[in-house]
Amino acid sequence: MSSEPPPRRARGPGEEQNMTEIDAFPRREIFDPTEKYKMDHKRRGIALIFNHERFFWHLTLPNRPGTSADRDNLRRRFSDLGFEVKCFDDLRAEELLLKIHEASTASHVDADCFLCVFLSHGEGNHIYAYDAKIEIQTLTGLFKGDKCQSLVGKPKIFIIQACRGSQHDVPVIPLDVVDHRTDTPDANLTQVDAASVYTLPAGADFLMCYSVAEGYYSHRETVNGSWYIQDLCEMLGKFGSSLEFTELLTLVNRKVSQRRVDFCRDPNAIGKKQVPCFASMLTKKLHFSPKSK
């Protein structure tokens, strides 16, 4: 009996060849699950922090006391990791877009990555500048490969601490401190904000970090800053140069989710919790190893 395989049947009219699209691309010989992003360029990269505490009156958005603590905390932590940190306060939408455009058209050839933080109110797929809202995808889109060639294949990290300023902005007075006084200007009040910023995909090598997942609440203390940024900065201080970054973000999720409002004068705020989230389009492991001097 012949061992030869039977001849292939000729395709009839209208029949298409069964071929996967990936066959058109060269295959990698070795797939390394431990592969890391190259983080030994001349410089770490730029970290932009857009901080918004006050807003144009016509937007009817409340101020965000405590956000300057977030800004300063982030500036210290990212500087420690080797970033060139640039902070901007209460920019108008046109000014903010100009700064983003300048960053996207700058050369990042000798940089490891790019990082951008927004501290503001948010709604849907927008965040608020001083005088208008801006679509998040408008901002991230400027850093995609066709717009920003020098960041192709490099991590692009966006951190969004955005909470909705509406009827859910309930001041919560912590009563678990013996000497707490609500009539002092420095009282550290907690504000409970409804989550309303959608998690949006951005593209390959993007990492989108959100202070709160949809359906939960975002908390910001008027003196110490937001829960999310407080815990993010604590984890960056402890593990920023040693732990893989998405693993660090998972620790942040855990720490924030363990917080709760236990004692307050508003009974509706008791038990409110917060769960951050991140959407990773990274293709390799991300480590902020110390830069050599």
Swiss-Prot record:
Ranges for region Tri-arginine exosite: 42-44
In the UniProt record, does the keyword Repeat occur? no
Q: Where is the lipid attached (S-palmitoyl cysteine)?
A: 264, 277
Q: Which UniProt keywords apply?
A: Apoptosis, Autocatalytic cleavage, Cytoplasm, Hydrolase, Lipoprotein, Nucleus, Palmitate, Phosphoprotein, Protease, Thiol protease, Zymogen
Specify where the region named Disordered lies, as residue ranges: 1-20
Please verify whether the record's keywords include Transmembrane helix: no
Q: Which residues form the propeptide?
A: 1-23, 180-193
Annotated region 130's region: the residues are 125-142
**Quaternary state and interactors:** Heterotetramer that consists of two anti-parallel arranged heterodimers, each one formed by a 18 kDa (p18) and a 11 kDa (p11) subunits. Interacts with BIRC6/bruce. Interacts with RIPK3.
The domain section of the record reads: The N-terminal disordered prodomain is required to prevent self-activation. The Tri-arginine exosite is required to recruit substrates for hydrolysis.
What this protein is called in its record is Caspase-6
Protein species of origin = Bos taurus
